[in-house]
Amino acid sequence: MIRHSKTVLQKAHELEQKKNYTIRIGVSLMNPAAILLKQWKQASILYPDVRLEIVPFEDTVPAFLEVLDNLGSKIDLLSCPYDTKHWGDRYNSFHLMDLPLKVSCSKSHPLAEKDHLTLEDLYEQTLLLANRGLNPYTDPVWNELESMYPQIHLKGVDYVDIHLFNQLVTSQELLLSAECWDSVHPLLTTIPVDWSFTMPYGLIYSKNPSPELLQFLLAVGQVESV
């Protein structure tokens, strides 16, 4: 099993023969791949033999888990946050960057006009975030805010999906979010917060990747994060 970026790069370097091939990227509203495509725009200059194909899939938990279980079949990889216990041990991961956690809210929310938020801005607000134990990047948020900022009301959710974003439009609640979801809903806005919380973002792919996919990971890995 190839789990770490360095191992992927070492394996990909062993590939000597270049040929034209297609990498199929799964996309949905919650997994738009915009960050990957920005990075690939730079790498593609050096790898003109690689073609990308966008494969849409439904934004539901069953559909997402089916994609994970069949990576390498109709879809080669996803570009999204990763390392969550909710998905289980279904895939390999290639780290691209750590994204700062932000806050999303309705454009009618009193905080929506701010360019950035302080923790004091969140006082007496309700912040939605993944339940404890679902992933390693929201647990520190729970720990710090509960112990040091009890004025912020925390509310756990089992899954962040498009339905939750839709509910947020008519709610006064806030949602823990990130740059990769900036454009998920046109009636929501996403605002940076004065804290240091981040989440890992990268590519998830089959446990048995093809040589072509390894070559693609090498190409993306050679480009500095955008």
What name fits each language-model region?
Residues 2, 120-123, 200-226:
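Extended ligand-binding regions for polar small-molecule ligands
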Residues 68-80, 101, 167-176:
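Alpha-to-beta junction loops
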Residues 3-26, 44-45, 90-93:
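Short helix-loop hinge/linker segments at domain boundaries
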Residues 39-48, 69, 137-153:
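Ligand-binding cleft/hinge of the Venus flytrap
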Residues 20-85:
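Central regulatory/effector-binding core of bacterial HTH transcription factors
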Residues 89-101, 105-127, 214:
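Flexible hinge/capping segments at coil-to-helix
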Residues 88-94, 99, 163-211:
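Beta-alpha-beta core module
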Residues 35-36, 87, 124-149:
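Secondary-structure junction motif
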